[in-house]
């Protein structure tokens, strides 16, 4: 299945074989019809913000280019965009291509092949090709079956998973319930950096060879999403090689599972790998997902290159084909280079402004009359003073305007929530006067200078915007590593932070940022010290509600409160960007994790000038890898 995006419109389809039409099977999936040889079929196209439509997809026998017939009532631009999307996807996989090497570079080094040893998202993006989970994300961010063929909720705290039969590990061993039980218990054990995600799991029970029950302490409606990162290992292989425990993932670390792998995924690790060396992945010819490998990338060679400049030079010299963690400041220049293609899409991270709404007075500021951020009118006035067009311009369009604290694609997001109020200085000044701050006040803005694309420039742009309503801002520019402890110790009055949704659900955003802070994990980054009983009740209900429709409604109500109370000021949703040779056909997935089974490598690689890749002033900073969600 291929997912493509253009002009904000998303289409999902499988490839088209000669003489095989499509028929509709699910809302976001096309499947080859059993009536092969007929000329016509129906396909399903999902449009962002629009109802589903079913265009005709015609792929006659003996032809190499399908025709797409779209409803005549659609606007011309929409018809052109959708036709281009579908043809790109259909043509991309219509003709089988011979295997071709794909060389992939990123900043993060793989120090262990143990799927339970490193929580870093880039490491998991690589190891997902080798080790699989019970569930996975579809290109449309829906949870779909992987090693589990189906599942159901037996009671509010017991989930039953039925394993897919016929699945084999790379060494030929069959997948059993014993392997799943062992893997989930291993993941929760000592040494695992991923164990916290299963903190609410009480036990894993084997029902038979292909059925398990996961018993929880409390209802956990997100369990199928959480399990997408719970990789399954072979128990017998682990026991034979004394790899039943997770060893710390450090350079030079020992342990059989550190240097060897035995998963069920579409790729397997080539022999001879050791930490510090490029990791070569070879196609698994016995993968269970027949027809799920439309690409031709084989082998895939992953190489860690720490320096941004070195990664881009390697791309220019033709030494690598794909770079997936670029500094956003480089994107405008890279888009102008003829030898490369840059793909961008909105990520799951949102930049926002937070304010201390608890203290009686500002620790870093001067107002003359208490803490102005405790007044919703002041917070609302600050939001009305922000000019989104200016922010987009100074950030090289590497952001998308945001009206809520979660990004598009995250469960709970709606277009209405994400709609920003227009800049209105007159109304903002009126609100400031009503709150008793017509003369304004002084405050310090803590701003990271090495974490997000154009982070300091965005902070600098906010200064004159807020000055127009009397708020005099001084910027405290500091590394991201210094900002985090300030927030953890409540040592800030005003700050900018980015926050993401690794499980594509708004609950963790709300729990971390807006839930009343306590001695427990709840409200960990609620440095604003928001404490709203109604908001807390909605979050608690969403945390334990197993009905997905009702639960999404609860999340949307909670996000509406955050928006109307101006508890945070959303600035923008960050864009993600990958750069690759023009010989590479790859669409950036919303998950930000490339699936190499979809990649098609064609033609010859073209280089670009080294001068064009030089870092611009103030933009060549290396952004450190941080937590998944900040």
Q: What is each PLM-predicted segment?
A:
Residues 47, 53, 152, 196-246:
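Surface-exposed binding/hinge segments that line
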Residues 105-155, 162, 185, 196, ...:
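N-terminal lobe/hinge region of extracytoplasmic solute-binding protein
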Residues 160, 376-380, 384, 392, ...:
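Extracytoplasmic/peripheral linker and loop segments enriched in polar/acidic and small residues
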Residues 255, 286-333, 376, 472-474:
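Ligand-site clamp/hinge motif
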């Amino acid at each position: 299945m291929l997912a493509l995006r253009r002009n904000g419109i998303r289409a999902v389809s499988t490839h088209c074989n000669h003489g095989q039409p499509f028929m509709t099977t699910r809302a976001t999936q096309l499947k080859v019809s059993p009536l092969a040889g007929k000329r016509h079929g129906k396909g399903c196209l999902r449009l962002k913000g629009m109802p589903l439509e079913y265009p005709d997809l015609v792929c006659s026998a003996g032809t190499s280019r399908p025709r797409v017939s779209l409803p005549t009532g659609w606007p011309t631009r929409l018809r052109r965009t959708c036709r281009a999307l579908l043809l790109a996807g259909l043509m991309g996989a219509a003709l089988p291509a011979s295997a071709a090497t794909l060389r992939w570079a990123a900043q993060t080094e793989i120090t262990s092949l143990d799927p339970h040893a490193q929580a870093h998202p880039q490491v998991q993006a690589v190891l997902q090709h080798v080790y699989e989970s019970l569930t996975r994300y579809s290109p449309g961010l829906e949870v779909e079956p992987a090693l589990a063929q189906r599942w159901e909720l037996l009671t509010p705290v017991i989930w039953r998973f039925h394993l897919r039969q016929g699945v084999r590990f790379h060494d030929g061993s069959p997948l059993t319930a014993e392997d799943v039980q062992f893997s989930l218990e291993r993941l929760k054990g000592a040494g695992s950096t991923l164990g916290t995600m299963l903190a609410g799991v009480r036990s894993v029970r084997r029902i038979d060879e292909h059925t398990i029950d996961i018993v929880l302490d409390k209802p956990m409606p997100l369990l199928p999403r959480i399990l997408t990162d719970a990789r399954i290992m072979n128990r017998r292989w682990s026991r034979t090689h004394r790899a039943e425990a997770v060893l710390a993932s450090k350079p030079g670390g020992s342990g059989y599972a550190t240097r060897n792998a035995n998963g069920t995924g579409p790729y397997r690790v080539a022999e001879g790998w050791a930490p510090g060396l490029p990791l070569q992945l070879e196609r698994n010819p016995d993968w269970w997902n027949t027809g799920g490998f439309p690409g031709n990338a084989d082998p895939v060679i992953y190489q860690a290159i720490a320096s941004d400049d070195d990664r881009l030079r390697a791309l220019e010299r033709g030494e690598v084909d794909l770079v997936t963690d670029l500094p956003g400041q480089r994107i405008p220049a890279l888009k102008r280079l003829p030898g490369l293609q840059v793909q961008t899409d909105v990520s799951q991270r949102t930049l926002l402004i937070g304010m201390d709404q608890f203290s009686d007075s500002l620790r870093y500021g001067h107002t003359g009359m208490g803490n102005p951020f405790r007044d919703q009118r002041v917070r609302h006035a600050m939001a009305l003073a922000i000019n989104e067009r200016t922010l987009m311009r100074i950030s090289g369009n590497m952001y998308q305007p945001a009206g809520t604290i979660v990004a598009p694609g995250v469960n709970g997001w709606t277009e209405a929530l994400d709609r920003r109020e227009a800049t209105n200085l007159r109304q903002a000044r009126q609100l400031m006067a009503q709150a008793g701050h017509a003369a304004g006040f002084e405050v310090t803005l803590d701003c990271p200078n090495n974490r997000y694309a154009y982070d300091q420039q965005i902070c600098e742009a906010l200064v004159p915007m807020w000055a127009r309503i009397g708020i005099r801002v001084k910027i405290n520019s500091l590394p991201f590593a210094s900002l985090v402890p300030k927030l953890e110790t409540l040592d800030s009055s005003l700050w900018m932070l980015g926050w993401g949704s690794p499980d594509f659900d708004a609950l963790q955003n709300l729990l971390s940022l807006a839930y009343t802070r306590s001695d427990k994990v709840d409200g960990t980054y609620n440095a604003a010290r928001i404490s709203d009983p109604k908001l807390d009740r909605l979050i608690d209900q969403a945390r334990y509600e197993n009905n997905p429709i009702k639960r999404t409604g609860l999340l949307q109500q909670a996000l509406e409160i955050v928006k109307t109370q101006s508890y945070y000021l959303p600035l923008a949703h960050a864009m993600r960007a990958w750069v690759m040779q023009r010989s590479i056909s790859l669409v950036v997935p919303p998950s930000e994790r490339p699936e190499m089974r979809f990649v098609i490598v064609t033609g010859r690689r073209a280089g670009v000038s080294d001068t064009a890749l030089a870092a611009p002033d103030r933009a060549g900073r290396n952004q450190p890898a941080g937590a998944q969600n900040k």
